[in-house]
């Protein structure tokens, strides 16, 4: 009996082994496997086999554990009903062409309505304005300076009176005269001595030669009261001190500035040059004219040389030396403006270009040339 049973067991084992031949081999997962190595499960198609095994296991579990229907708190509608509901909620979209056509039609209609309303408003406003103007013109005293029917004026037009009674009438009233400025009033004097029309014409002809225009004669100024206001010293003018030649020291002669670069500016201890108006500590000239006043006779070395061709040392050692303003040849901007002339500016380079050593000689030659032409 025992041998028989053993044979039956061997036969059963062989049959089971034959069935096991057709089962796929599954590699076991080890902790040493990783994605970086070539022996990973992904390279052996292990993931697919594992998913299939899980699906088969799930099927068997569901078949074993399925005892009744699944109960949940809220039941979802079936797929067919949900699709129908979504289709009902979405409205049908109209074609794009119809939308654009309707928009363009509405815009054209609104534009036409706006233009019509605008034209109507303009027409109404014009009518209202014309009505108001007609009502205003109907009143007699509404526009005092304006007449409804202006008639021809019978009164002859009288010539306009001049502002200055002592001046002769102009033959050409349309031409405007030069304005009476402060500088012109100094030259011309009072209002009674204003020039006549012929003199103004001569002045206009000489305007193109403003640089060397002739100065008005000072013959009429006989006494001090008749002198212009600018020729009299003011109350704040410094007293003029005439220094004799014996008081001039060698230190002062050595302190004479020969170049503008050698100037040292000092507003508390320096002295002012009449020409350049700069306050420096170098030695200036001293006018020996007792009637001179203030700092009018003080000239620095560069200004006296470039403007008048003289030296400060010679002027200090000359007991009869008079400053250019006292001689009437000063060409600084203040003196020229007082005489009715324009300022020359930096004219020394132009004078040297034409062969003259100083500005005074160049202006004198220009004046002689224009007098010969006239």
Curated annotation (Swiss-Prot):
Subunit details: Interacts with MYC (via C-terminus), YWHAE and YWHAZ.
Segments of this protein annotated with the region Disordered: 53-110, 138-208
One GO BP annotation of this record: apoptotic process
This protein's name: Cell division cycle-associated protein 7
Chain span(s) of sequence motif Nuclear localization signal: 160-176
Glycyl lysine isopeptide (Lys-Gly) (interchain with G-Cter in SUMO2) cross-link site: 208
Location relative to the cell: Nucleus; Cytoplasm
Organism domain of life: Eukaryota
A GO cellular component annotation in the UniProt record: cytoplasm
Modified residues (Phosphothreonine): 163, 196
Biased composition (Acidic residues): 196-207
Region (Mediates transcriptional activity): 250-374
Positions where Phosphoserine occurs in the chain: 142, 190, 217
Keyword Transcription regulation part of the UniProt annotation: yes
Coiled coil: none
Record-linked InterPro entries: CDCA7/CDA7L (IPR040221), Znf-4CXXC_R1 (IPR018866)
Functional summary from the UniProt entry: Participates in MYC-mediated cell transformation and apoptosis; induces anchorage-independent growth and clonogenicity in lymphoblastoid cells. Insufficient to induce tumorigenicity when overexpressed but contributes to MYC-mediated tumorigenesis. May play a role as transcriptional regulator.
Keywords: Apoptosis, Cytoplasm, Isopeptide bond, Nucleus, Phosphoprotein, Transcription, Transcription regulation, Ubl conjugation
Predominant location: nucleus
């Amino acid at each position: 009996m025992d041998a028989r049973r053993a044979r039956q067991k061997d036969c059963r084992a062989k049959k089971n082994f034959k069935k096991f031949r057709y089962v796929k081999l599954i590699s076991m997962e080890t902790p040493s496997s990783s994605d970086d190595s070539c022996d990973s499960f992904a390279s052996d198609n292990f993931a697919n086999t594992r998913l299939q095994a899980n699906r088969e296991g799930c099927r068997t579990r569901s078949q074993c554990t399925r005892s009744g229907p699944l109960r949940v708190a809220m039941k979802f509608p079936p797929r067919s009903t949900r699709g129908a509901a979504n289709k009902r909620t979405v409205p049908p979209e109209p074609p794009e062409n119809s939308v654009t056509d309707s928009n363009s039609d509405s815009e054209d209609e609104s534009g036409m309505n706006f233009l019509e309303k605008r034209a109507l408003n303009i027409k109404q406003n014009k009518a209202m304005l014309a009505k108001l103007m007609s009502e205003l013109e109907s009143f007699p005293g509404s526009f005092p300076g304006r007449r409804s029917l202006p008639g021809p004026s019978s009164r002859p037009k009288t010539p306009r009176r001049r502002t200055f009674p002592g001046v002769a009438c102009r033959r050409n009233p349309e031409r405007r005269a030069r304005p009476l400025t402060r500088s012109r009033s100094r030259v011309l004097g009072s209002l009674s001595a204003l020039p006549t029309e012929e003199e103004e014409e001569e002045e206009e002809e000489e305007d193109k030669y403003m640089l060397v225009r002739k100065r008005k004669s000072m013959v009429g100024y006989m006494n001090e009261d008749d002198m212009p206001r600018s020729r009299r010293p003011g109350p704040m003018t410094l007293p003029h001190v005439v220094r004799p030649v014996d008081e001039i020291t060698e230190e002062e002669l050595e302190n004479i500035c020969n170049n503008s670069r050698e100037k040292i500016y000092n507003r508390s201890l320096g002295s002012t040059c009449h020409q350049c108006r700069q306050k420096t500590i170098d030695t200036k000239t001293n006018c020996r004219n007792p009637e001179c006043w203030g700092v009018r006779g003080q000239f620095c070395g560069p200004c006296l040389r470039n403007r008048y061709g003289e030296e400060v040392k010679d002027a200090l050692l000359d007991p009869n030396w008079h400053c250019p303003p006292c001689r009437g040849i000063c060409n600084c901007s203040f003196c020229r403006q007082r005489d009715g002339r324009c300022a020359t500016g930096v004219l020394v380079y132009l004078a040297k270009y034409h062969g003259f050593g100083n500005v005074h000689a160049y202006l004198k030659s220009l004046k002689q040339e224009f007098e010969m032409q006239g």
